[in-house]
C-alpha cells in the first residue's frame, strides 16, 4: 500500500526491514530497558483493533530516514488522501488491506504468532493470579480482555 505525503510516495512493504524497524521502535521495554521484541505483535493487535495511531506509526516508520521526518499531521493528511482515492467513508478498507498484507508476510506472521504465544502465557498468569486477587472484578476484566485480544488476532490470522 502506498501513501502520498506532500510530493513523496511512501510505500508500506511488510518485509524484513520494516519488521526490524517496527520491533526496534514500537516494542515495549523490560525493567532493564531492553527490548521485548514485541513491536510487530503489538502493531498487529492495534491494526486488528482498528487503532488509527497504528496507521500513523506505519507511515512514519516507512518514510525514508534520509528525507525529512513525517509528522503526525502529514501522516493523517496522507490517510485522508488515501480515503479519497479509495472513495471510502471510513478507514476500514485501509485497515483490512494492511491486516491482509501483514498476515501474508512470513516475517510478520511469525512474529505475530510468537506474540500470541506470549499473550497466552500472560493469560495463564492472570488466571492464576486472579484466584488471590483482592479486586476480582478487575482481575476478571483483564482476563476477558486478554482472551478477546487473542481471539481477534487468531481470527485475523485464519
Identify the residue ranges that each predicted region occupies:
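Charged interaction scaffolds used for protein-protein
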Residues: 1-6, 29-46, 53, 65-158
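Short, extreme N-terminal segment that most often corresponds to the first beta-strand
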Residues: 1-25
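Alpha-helix-centered segments that form part of catalytic cores
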Residues: 56
Amino acid at each position: 500500500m502506498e501513501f502520498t505525503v506532500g510530493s513523496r510516495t511512501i510505500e508500506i512493504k511488510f518485509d524484513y526491514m520494516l519488521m526490524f524497524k517496527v520491533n526496534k521502535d514500537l516494542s515495549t521495554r523490560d525493567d532493564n530497558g531492553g527490548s521485548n521484541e514485541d513491536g510487530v505483535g503489538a502493531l498487529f493487535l492495534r491494526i486488528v483493533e482498528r487503532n488509527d495511531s497504528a496507521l500513523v506509526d506505519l507511515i512514519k516508520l516507512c518514510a525514508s530516514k534520509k528525507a525529512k521526518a513525517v509528522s503526525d499531521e502529514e501522516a493523517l493528511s496522507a490517510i485522508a488522501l488515501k480515503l479519497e482515492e479509495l472513495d471510502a467513508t471510513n478507514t476500514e478498507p485501509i485497515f483490512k488491506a494492511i491486516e491482509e498484507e501483514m498476515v501474508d508476510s512470513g516475517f510478520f506472521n511469525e512474529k505475530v504468532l510468537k506474540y500470541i504465544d506470549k499473550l497466552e502465557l500472560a493469560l495463564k498468569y492472570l488466571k492464576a493470579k486472579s484466584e488471590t486477587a483482592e479486586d476480582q472484578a478487575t482481575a476478571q476484566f483483564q482476563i476477558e480482555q486478554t482472551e478477546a485480544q487473542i481471539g481477534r488476532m487468531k481470527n485475523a490470522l485464519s
